[in-house]
């Protein structure tokens, strides 16, 4: 039997790319053209087109570049003197031949048109009360998720947002999982495959493959917000996040830095600020030192706040899957303090009970606080919690590209410090895992990645190369000059929480 692709068709040579000269009247979504970027011409794919007062504008993705560089460009930046690549025409679906499969008599037919409960108004971010949210009806839960696909694929927001701007109850869960970095071709292949899957298979694929959204349409690849104002910072979002569709027309989206409610109107935001009394994340403060504090927030007790946090973080995290159930997660939020309150710097989420032994599900440092060492603090804090639990842990796999770099740096620095301990002559990978609360697999992969594991005279030995030692010395010199932030385990006031069965499961 010959090689076949995912659709069952024989795999052969790829279809030839159709090229030709385009004009502003003939150019369309999916075309790849040369665009002026930073003084150079770069190939870019057109993802969306809209009419502005000053003419046509094109939302482009630069081929082989990170999606955070996607942007709207004026027509003058397109070089139409060169040939463009036209998108491949869609192939007609082949009808499957053969007798229809009779339904099983043992399976009970499930009603496909049960009413779905409306989502509470608090989800819109307006008039939000960060208190104990109402328990959503289970009518929007897992048992009601059929195989149907939204018919209107031209919506600017995702299927998680209804026409009135309120996230639908069908997606009552937000779960943001790290996934591997994939290039544009892989994403397209995955998105094409998603169209042939059932809802359950699609969700499972999203959790493991790194696809950005459930709906395989081009509109979801377009960043929908232009600018955020959060506290004293103006922030440019990187990626799409399913905020209400009306927010895409706002010049600035205002986010309350304490309760994380969101507004597309400055006056409404200012009125909210006069009434909002929250000055820190709505949870228990479990760590405090001279610089930062950590708050533990239960997704079940503070659903609205945690959902708002996940919506915000989706703007800066690619290849994430969003659901609207935060009940099975704890959120550990890192803040800086001043006279006005505790300002959110970053967070990581953690499953209340992970069958795979993960100690972290999703991690983010907000852009305005990046490159200051806060990411390493978040990673370090997650392992301090694992040490307090007496367990080894690992971040949810696979990691994003930036997440993998951050973790590898932390793993290497942690292992090198232990290996350079003068009072330790021999050590095994298992002992390193117990000392650091890292898994043996993470220990082994770190040693292999940085060429610290060698085979000599019939046994494996750990070797610290000159390069590794030199990098450590440079880091220590830099820390002497600039200082360094570290987690002090003695300041951690925390015991591993114990949950009932209902509080650590999906709210379906």
From Swiss-Prot:
Residue stretches making up the MYST-type HAT domain: 220-496
Domain Tudor-knot: 27-80
SMART domains from the UniProt entry: CHROMO (SM00298)
Annotated site residue numbers, Important for catalytic activity: 362
Modified how: Autoacetylation at Lys-320 is required for proper function.
Sites of N6-acetyllysine modification: 320
Short sequence motif ESA1-RPD3 motif: positions: 303-324
Leading EC class: transferase
Gene Ontology molecular function, alphabetical: chromatin binding; histone acetyltransferase activity; histone crotonyltransferase activity; histone H4K12 acetyltransferase activity; peptide 2-hydroxyisobutyryltransferase activity; transcription coregulator activity
Zinc finger C2HC MYST-type: from-to: 253-278
Keywords: Acetylation, Activator, Chromatin regulator, Chromosome, DNA damage, DNA repair, Nucleus, Transcription, Transcription regulation, Transferase
GO CC term, one of those recorded: NuA4 histone acetyltransferase complex
GO biological process, one term: regulation of cell cycle
Xref: Gene3D superfamilies: 2.30.30.140, 3.40.630.30, N-acetyl transferase-like (3.30.60.60), Winged helix-like DNA-binding domain superfamily/Winged helix DNA-binding domain (1.10.10.10)
Residues binding acetyl-CoA: 361-365, 370-376, 400
EC nos: 2.3.1.48, 2.3.1.-
Chain positions covered by the region annotation Disordered: 84-150
Subcellular location field: Nucleus; Chromosome
Compositionally biased spans, kind Polar residues: 119-131
Subunit structure: Component of the NuA4 histone acetyltransferase complex.
Function recorded in the entry: Catalytic component of the NuA4 histone acetyltransferase (HAT) complex which is involved in epigenetic transcriptional activation of selected genes principally by acetylation of nucleosomal histones H4, H3, H2B, H2A and H2A variant H2A.Z. Acetylates histone H4 to form H4K5ac, H4K8ac, H4K12ac and H4K16ac, histone H3 to form H3K14ac, and histone H2A to form H2AK4ac and H2AK7ac. The NuA4 complex is involved in the DNA damage response and is required for chromosome segregation. The NuA4 complex plays a direct role in repair of DNA double-strand breaks (DSBs) through homologous recombination.
Entry remark concerning the domains of this protein: The ESA1-RPD3 motif is common to ESA1 and RPD3 and is required for ESA1 histone acetyl-transferase (HAT) activity and RPD3 histone deacetylase (HDAC) activity.
UniProt-recorded name of the protein: Histone acetyltransferase esa1
Lineage: Eukaryota, Fungi, Dikarya, Ascomycota, Pezizomycotina
Gene behind this protein: esa1
């Amino acid at each position: 039997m010959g090689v076949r692709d995912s659709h069952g068709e024989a795999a052969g040579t790829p279809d030839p790319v159709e090229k030709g000269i385009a004009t502003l009247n003939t150019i369309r979504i999916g075309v790849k053209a040369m665009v002026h970027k930073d003084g150079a011409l770069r190939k870019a794919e057109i993802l969306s087109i809209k009419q502005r007062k000053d003419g046509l504008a094109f939302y482009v993705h630069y081929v082989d570049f990170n999606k955070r560089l996607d942007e709207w460009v004026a027509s003058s930046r397109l070089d139409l003197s060169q040939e463009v690549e036209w998108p491949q025409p869609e192939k007609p679906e082949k009808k499957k031949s053969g007798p229809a499969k009779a339904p099983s008599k043992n399976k009970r037919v499930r009603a496909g048109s049960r009413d779905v409960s409306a989502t509470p108004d608090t989800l819109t971010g307006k008039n939000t009360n960060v208190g104990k949210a109402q328990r959503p009806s289970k009518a929007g839960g897992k048992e009601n998720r059929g195989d149907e696909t939204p018919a209107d694929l031209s919506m600017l927001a995702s299927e998680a947002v209804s026409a009135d701007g309120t996230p639908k109850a069908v997606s009552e869960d937000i779960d943001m999982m790290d996934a591997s970095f994939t290039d544009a071709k892989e994403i397209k292949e995955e998105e094409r495959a998603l169209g042939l899957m059932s809802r359950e298979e699609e969700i499972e694929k999203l959790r493991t493959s790194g696809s950005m959204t459930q709906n395989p349409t081009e509109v979801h690849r377009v960043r929908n917000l232009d600018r955020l104002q959060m506290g004293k910072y103006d922030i440019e979002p990187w990626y799409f996040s399913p905020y209400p569709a009306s927010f895409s027309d706002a010049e600035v989206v205002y986010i309350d830095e304490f309760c994380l409610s969101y507004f597309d109107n400055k006056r409404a935001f200012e009125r909210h600020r006069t009434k909002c009394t929250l000055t820190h994340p709505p949870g228990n403060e479990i760590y405090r030192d001279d610089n930062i504090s950590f708050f533990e927030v239960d997704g079940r007790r503070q659903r609205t706040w945690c959902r708002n946090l996940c919506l915000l973080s989706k703007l800066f995290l690619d290849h994430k899957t969003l659901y609207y159930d935060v009940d099975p997660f704890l959120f550990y939020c890192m803040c800086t303090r001043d006279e006005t309150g505790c300002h959110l710097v970053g967070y990581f989420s953690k499953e209340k009970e992970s069958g795979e032994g993960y100690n972290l599900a999703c991690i983010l440092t907000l852009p305005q606080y990046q490159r200051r060492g806060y990411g390493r603090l978040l990673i370090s804090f997650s392992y301090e919690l694992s040490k307090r639990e007496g367990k080894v842990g690992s971040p949810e796999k696979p990691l994003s590209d930036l997440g993998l770099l951050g973790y590898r740096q932390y793993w290497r620095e942690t292992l090198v410090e232990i290996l350079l301990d003068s009072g330790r002559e021999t050590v095994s990978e298992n002992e390193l895992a117990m000392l650091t609360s890292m898994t043996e697999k993470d220990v082994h992969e770190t040693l292999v990645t940085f060429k610290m594991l060698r085979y000599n005279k019939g046994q494996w030995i750990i070797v610290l190369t000159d390069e590794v030692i030199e990098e450590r010395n440079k880091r220590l010199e830099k820390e002497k000059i600039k200082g360094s932030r570290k987690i002090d385990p003695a300041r951690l006031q925390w015991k591993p929480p114990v949950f009932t069965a209902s509080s650590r499961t999906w709210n379906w």
